[in-house]
Amino acid sequence: MAKKCMVNREIKRIKTVKKFAAKREELKEIIRKVATYSDEERAAAQEKLQKLPRNASPSRVQRRCRITGRPHAVYRKFGLSRIKLRELTMRGEVPGVRKASW
């Protein structure tokens, strides 16, 4: 089990990403459009983007297992780590999933 503080930190990061998502996208759009905006406007937008909190970047968020909080080997489709996914599948608690046999 991951520490509660680590799980809470990830939740806080997710909230921060959602809070600044529109502003980040707006600034990135200004930076991308070379023909529309002047160099000064683009430089100002880049500076504003750099001043946003680091945790506002989506790449800082790490997927964690919903049950254990484990950060590695988490399946996106289920939101579970490989260990918990196997346990729940073997007990038949994950609908539509069963052990392969051929």
Curated annotation (Swiss-Prot):
Lineage runs: Bacteria, Pseudomonadati, Pseudomonadota, Gammaproteobacteria, Cardiobacteriales
Q: Does the keyword RNA-binding apply?
A: yes
Role description: Binds 16S rRNA, required for the assembly of 30S particles and may also be responsible for determining the conformation of the 16S rRNA at the A site.
Q: Which domain of life is it from?
A: Bacteria
Molecular function (Gene Ontology), one example: rRNA binding
Q: Which HAMAP family match?
A: Ribosomal_uS14_1
Query: Could you describe the subunit structure of this protein?
Result: Part of the 30S ribosomal subunit. Contacts proteins S3 and S10.
Name under which the protein is recorded: Small ribosomal subunit protein uS14
Which keywords describe this protein according to UniProt? Ribonucleoprotein, Ribosomal protein, RNA-binding, rRNA-binding
Return one Gene Ontology term, BP aspect: translation
Task: Provide the Gene Ontology terms for cellular component.
Answer: cytoplasm; small ribosomal subunit
